[in-house]
A protein has these predicted regions:
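Residue-level recognition of pore/gate-forming positions within transmembrane alpha-helices
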Residues: 40-44, 98-102, 124-127, 131, ...
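Membrane-interface interhelical linkers
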Residues: 1-88, 136-152, 183-236, 259-285, ...
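C-terminal transmembrane-helix exit sites in multi-pass transporters
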Residues: 81, 100-122, 132, 236, ...
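Helix-coil boundary and interhelical linker segments in multi-pass alpha-helical membrane proteins
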Residues: 1-4, 52-62, 107-119, 166-176, ...
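Structural motif at transmembrane-helix junctions in multi-pass transporters
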Residues: 27-34, 80-96, 115, 170-177, ...
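Hydrophobic core positions of alpha-helical segments in small-molecule transporters
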Residues: 9, 37-38, 96-99, 119-122, ...
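Selected transmembrane alpha-helices and immediately adjacent juxtamembrane segments
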Residues: 146-176
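Membrane-embedded alpha-helical core segments of multi-pass
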Residues: 13, 17, 73-80, 100-107, ...
Length: 295
């Protein structure tokens, strides 16, 4: 029972993090480089928490390019992600993270000729079909929201990062992997300071960052709690079960978003009209089923 509770805590806390992301993207910072810079800066401040579990080890320069790529992806996937949060409802954008579950087996097929089963192909089709339905605003004129393509790019980057992370963890311990990838993420984001116009905007918004630091800190805290809960659940439950539970995250975003809408209005980018709630809920259930089939 504790493992099951932990497995559901992961999508719950990550849903809260997604809603905070939407708030930061739509209401706090107008320029994405500024938002990403301060977000990564907060992540770096939180990185030393991993030292509670042990100290990072030095494994030589050979592994560093791989960890550098992991760190760079951790920065650049945020660009299409935050832009998507500005173009679509938060719960729908989060649902499109499920595209990553599709991309991993597809990449495996293309790169190492790993065959997919009929059930996996069916799951792939269900996820894509449900994602397309989420885009339909006018049944007479089907038009794909640009947020879908942005999340497709973001999911592709995260899928590549997951494969690289898995490869790195076969050679080094997880503490070192987390520490060095966070270090490279910070070095990458400091590159944002090179263009003068971006540097000036980051400097001009530093007082606002200090004022909103508690929001960034809360976001990092709930995100880390969700990640730890997922790791704990994976130690006791099958990975397929945990990942399937994780795919319910859009439902948590929708539920929390509806509650926040009732309290604060549409400050968190979520359409909670009856028709949209029903359509989203049905599509999210199908996406969850599709993820379970692909895994």
């Amino acid at each position: 029972m504790p493992a099951v509770i932990a497995a559901f805590l992961c999508p719950l806390f990550h849903a809260v993090s997604n809603i905070i992301d939407a708030h930061l993207s739509n209401n706090v910072f107008r320029k994405l480089p500024t938002l990403i810079f301060y977000n990564c800066l907060t992540n770096f401040f939180a990185a030393p928490m991993v030292l509670v579990f042990g100290l990072p080890q030095w494994y030589g320069w050979e592994i560093m390019p791989l960890l550098a790529l992991v760190g760079m992806i951790d920065v650049f996937y945020q660009i299409p992600y935050y832009e998507a949060l500005r173009r679509g409802d938060t719960s729908v954008v989060v649902a499109w993270f499920s595209l990553g579950y599709v991309l991993v087996p597809v990449l495996a097929y293309l790169m190492v000729d790993e065959k997919l089963s009929f059930v996996q192909y069916a799951g792939f089709g269900i996820i894509i079909a449900a994602s397309v339905v989420l885009n339909i605003e006018n049944p007479r004129k089907i038009k794909i929201n640009k947020a879908f393509y942005l999340m497709l790019l973001s999911s592709l980057l995260l899928s590549l990062q997951a494969v690289l992370y898995k490869y790195a963890l076969e050679k080094i311990d997880w503490i070192s992997a987390v520490f060095y990838s966070a270090l490279f993420s910070t070095l990458t984001v400091f590159g944002f300071l090179m263009p003068r116009i971006v540097r000036l905007n980051i400097k001009a918004n530093f007082p606002r960052y200090k004022t909103k630091f508690y929001v960034f800190g809360l976001n990092e805290f709930v995100n880390q709690v969700g990640t730890v809960a997922s790791i704990f659940a994976m130690s006791l439950l099958p990975v397929v079960a945990v990942e399937s539970i994780n795919s319910t995250q859009p439902l948590f975003v929708l539920g929390i978003g509806a509650a926040l809408y009732a309290l604060f209005g549409n400050r968190f980018k979520e359409d909670v009209s009856t028709v949209h709630l029903l359509r989203k809920s049905i599509c999210f259930v199908f996406i969850t089923a599709g993820v379970f089939m692909v895994l």
